[in-house]
Amino acid sequence: MGDNALDLATASSTPIPMPNTGQLVISPQDIGYSDPPKLRGRLKLEFVHDISLDANVEDPIALIPHGIWSIFKSKLAQMRCPKGYITYDKVILSWKPHVATGLARGQIAVVDTRVNHTSIEDLMHKALWKTAPVDLGCTYTIQGTVPYCLPFHPKEGGDVKSDLESQNPIRGIVYITDSRYQEAARHGALTMTLKLSIGTMPTDALTGPRATLSQPHLRDNLRSRSQRISRPPIGITQRPRRSLAEPPLEKEEEQESTLSSEASGSEQGLIIPVQGPSTSSRSRRVRG
């Protein structure tokens, strides 16, 4: 990560590197599966979740608002299905700071809080994906997916339902790695845009964070060299669809991707590495 990270201090004078699409890999992990019921229907939801972080920035924030769970339960009841599967088709995190540049550096990440962890630092180390340390005084937009679906019981008393609805384990986090003025770093707005699917058949999100050029002038400047960006990421392979009822485990293998960011109040765009999941491939059968 360190060799590929862009030094923000010299970003204005450093040529913008092209993303290495050969490292754009987030693959589903062979952790477990269950036999799904016959497919009867599928519901797609897309919504925006705005959070103003005036304090406790480092606390993970649930991506799914509490009120959305009632929609899941009612739709599954209409489909007369005993179990549904939630898929995070798209996760977009947008960070808009309320402080000047240069006051703090940190990482923006998506985590699964069900993994065994002893601290926020440990949880960040096992994040599904995260940025390299960036200047939290700049504006960033990061897009990715969760590479496995979550089983969900619509009825009261279902243990998986209780875990998912009460813990709401897939969360976004802004983690401060270095700050000259700690309280100043705890101010900003995190906008979470989600595209979810709920259905009676388990699915996997097979693509991870992609390189996106959000600024038109930056896209024009790189057009002559951007043929690789429009191609599917190298290394992503189709696998049998399965339900992963448990979070990733603990193998320390890091994969990198890229994200787009834009400096607040500046015309200079930045492309910053994103680390993929660190997981284990141990599988376990989960009864449906």
Swiss-Prot record:
Q: Where is the segment annotated Disordered?
A: 207-288
**Keyword list, A-Z:** Transport, Viral movement protein
Which GO BP annotation is one of this protein's? transport of virus in host, cell to cell
Q: What does this protein do?
A: Transports viral genome to neighboring plant cells directly through plasmosdesmata, without any budding. The movement protein allows efficient cell to cell propagation, by bypassing the host cell wall barrier (Potential).
- This protein is called what? Putative movement protein
